[in-house]
């Protein structure tokens, strides 16, 4: 996904001190952010001009100790054609030399009201999410009790219908049919809808419905962490399914492993309720409450007791 300076300005509510439409359309190619401390002393080895340059109180205070000529020299060396923008945090005044060098080198000058650490954290979170590599998977992503559940299965098994039933039960739709997933870090997987499919759900026999229009803003989410995968498959006699819940099946997406539960589908079975139970059971396990383990302990104790008798 392409992220521009204008998108960052809108997301973080930054003030544009200098920058025309062309400069605000510059792409940001990396989520890494530069705090140009050593660069202000004239040391530019290993400098990364393609990063957003963030000036905080420490850098700003040091700049005040320099002469006008040296301040201008620092910014002239710092600002390159590939530099997306420079951001001054805490609403600090923009040095005249910074403004002049930015104008000469075609770099947008922005100002943020938040503290440097807060601004840096918000930028990193946003840029990492937007610039992460994405993979599209077939399925329905629903937020169930605050936990992202990816529902997959064969075509025609009833994934979208199950998603609709879950929405009617108070849960929130994230994506239907195509789910774009990306890793924010090595252990966290997120999913979002394709741009053209936002808030839309396809139901065979009915067509495409707008979930937000029918059920309100509380029935949808723009993105969600993916924590559990559900695979729906037709129930067949003789086919073995996990009955104790001690299976450890996982799927891997974008290098992140998430647990998967297989649920058999047959006429008369309320699949949405079963998925709710699977989601709550997974959350309970994360909190240390494992019903399977409790059952196994009770069974072991009962066998031991009967053996003694």
UniProtKB/Swiss-Prot annotation:
Annotated binding of ATP, by residue: 153-160
Q: Which organism does this sequence originate in?
A: Streptococcus salivarius
Sequence segments annotated as region (Important for the catalytic mechanism of both phosphorylation and dephosphorylation): 201-210
Q: Name one GO biological process term.
A: regulation of carbohydrate metabolic process
PANTHER family in the cross-refs: HPR KINASE_PHOSPHORYLASE, PROTEIN YJDM-RELATED
What NCBIfam families has UniProt attached to this entry?
hpr-ser
Q: Which SUPFAM superfamilies match?
A: HprK N-terminal domain-like (SSF75138), PEP carboxykinase-like (SSF53795)
Q: Where does the secretion signal sit in this chain?
A: none
> What is this protein identified as?
HPr kinase/phosphorylase
Question: Which HAMAP family does the record match to this protein?
Answer: HPr_kinase
Q: Which residues does the entry assign to the active site, renumbered to this chain?
A: 138, 159, 177, 243
